[in-house]
Amino acid sequence: DIVLTQSPASLAVSLGQRATISCKASQSLDYDGDSYMNWYQQKPGQPPKLLIYAASNLESGIPARFSGSGSGTDFTLNIHPVEEEDAATYYCHQSEDPWTFGSGTKLEIK
């Protein structure tokens, strides 16, 4: 199975600043011109919400302050400017069978 190493485990960012979360895959996630990397946001008591799919595509209804980049084995989620409502845990996810997830990054807003 593909292992996703996500960092940092926790992050405290001041309101209006940038949050950057990294995810490294144990093998390339590039297939047929796409990168099979997705990013989710989860708040306590709620199901995960898809933010970014195929490395850099913004899911419908998600604010443009969320952006994704990367290819191959190295991927990044950026949030800028951070808002109070962005406090949550963020997960990277690869959608090659079998699916696997990163261990999560807890974002705190200062």
UniProtKB/Swiss-Prot annotation:
A GO biological-process term: immune response
Framework-4: annotated span: 101-110
Start and end residues of each stretch annotated as Complementarity-determining-1: 24-38
Keyword Transmembrane part of the UniProt annotation: no
Pfam families, alphabetized: V-set
SMART domains linked to this entry: IG (SM00409), IGv (SM00406)
Complementarity-determining-3: annotated span: 93-100
Protein name, entry field: Ig kappa chain V-III region PC 7210
